[in-house]
Amino acid sequence: MSEPLLIARTPDTELFLLPGMANRHGLITGATGTGKTVTLQKLAESLSEIGVPVFMADVKGDLTGVAQAGTVSEKLLARLKNIGVNDWQPHANPVVVWDIFGEKGHPVRATVSDLGPLLLARLLNLNDVQSGVLNIIFRIADDQGLLLLDFKDLRAITQYIGDNAKSFQNQYGNISSASVGAIQRGLLSLEQQGAAHFFGEPMLDIKDWMRTDANGKGVINILSAEKLYQMPKLYAASLLWMLSELYEQLPEAGDLEKPKLVFFFDEAHLLFNDAPQVLLDKIEQVIRLIRSKGVGVWFVSQNPSDIPDNVLGQLGNRVQHALRAFTPKDQKAVKAAAQTMRANPAFDTEKAIQELGTGEALISFLDAKGSPSVVERAMVIAPCSRMGPVTEDERNGLINHSPVYGKYEDEVDRESAYEMLQKGFQASTEQQNNPPAKGKEVAVDDGILGGLKDILFGTTGPRGGKKDGVVQTMAKSAARQVTNQIVRGMLGSLLGGRRR
């Protein structure tokens, strides 16, 4: 059985996180500069010590220091001595760095189909009507065996469906040119921001996070998010997609002695800001269900009020750093934060929140029965790793000596919707340049668009026989090579994604 993790201390009290309760989720809150990052780092390296892999997003660029041993100083030793810590020893931790843009870590990619229309609609800032059209686009792609892997696939099928909207209207409903235009503008905007890097293959294999090193320590996976953070919706969507991948791919585990992985979601308010209710409902569902897969999710934000109540109620472990109350709204937030913790008769929780110093926190971890412990005021013990970023040379060393180096660096562009539609256009052009011989019957729905539709999606003969088009032929060929192209994953019903 894993030993409890010592996270914080007072001169006469030790506060432990029970490994078996780490997957009951958690919350780290506090104003800027009060010590949230240090707490996050301490929790991450403590979990790593007992063989639990960790994922966390590095928004400020200062978490990578967890890969290097800390530096001993007189000030640090004096602070540790004041709270009764006498056995502190600096050490490094196993770290793999990731980056959606592929600049400061291994590239992270998802296919368009896997992200799904629900998250993509939020990325594109679509309204309900436009989101409905995006769902139709995904449905047509699914029905016709068109793989949506990268941005050019989505652009190509959006343009094709927009140009042929009337052909699909009877089966799928109205596809307005205005909605198609909004989707195309959204795609252009995302592409100009560099978001296209996120879409494609090889897609992230979530099992690459579930590693331990030769000494049995859990690997700490750090997503470089300084640039990504400037695109809040992509930041939130990409991390939520990662959570959904964990849920979809991991088997049911029940209650374990320690989690399979702990996922820290920094700047968590970005996940919920302006999110439609349907997405909020799905987020709540994912958080509730993922616990049974042995995954703990910890949100990091400034205030507990950043988290919707139905999600907040699922976060059993709490670390509350200082909050400032300069306005009536701030005072209300402090009071609400105090009410989320189990009161300690020894002090006024609401008052204490405003008095906490840097690195000091009000802490309530779950006990062995899963009940919140009485809140205690304590100092978070300094991490044994470096508090600050790695150098460029150190980062390059982490990348080049990573166990996944070479797996994600080169993008793969296999045959998908874009290539299928391009072949259809080429075949249609050839048909236009070589019209039927004189006297032969010409299809009623002639012209380049009608001809293209027949070439792409096939024709029906006078006796009802179906002749496959380019799409069907290529899809059948691809299906023989790839057994799981368009199969919906379990989370497809949750987030609208489709397995490749």
Swiss-Prot record:
Instruction: Tell me where on the tree of life, at the top rank, the source sits.
Output: Bacteria
Name the species this protein comes from: Escherichia coli (strain K12)
Gene3D superfamilies from the entry?
A: P-loop containing nucleotide triphosphate hydrolases
Put simply, this protein is called Uncharacterized protein YjgR
Q: Which gene encodes it?
A: yjgR
Q: Which InterPro entries match?
A: HerA_C (IPR033186), P-loop_NTPase (IPR027417), T4SS_component (IPR051162)
Family the UniProt entry places it in: To E.coli YjiB.
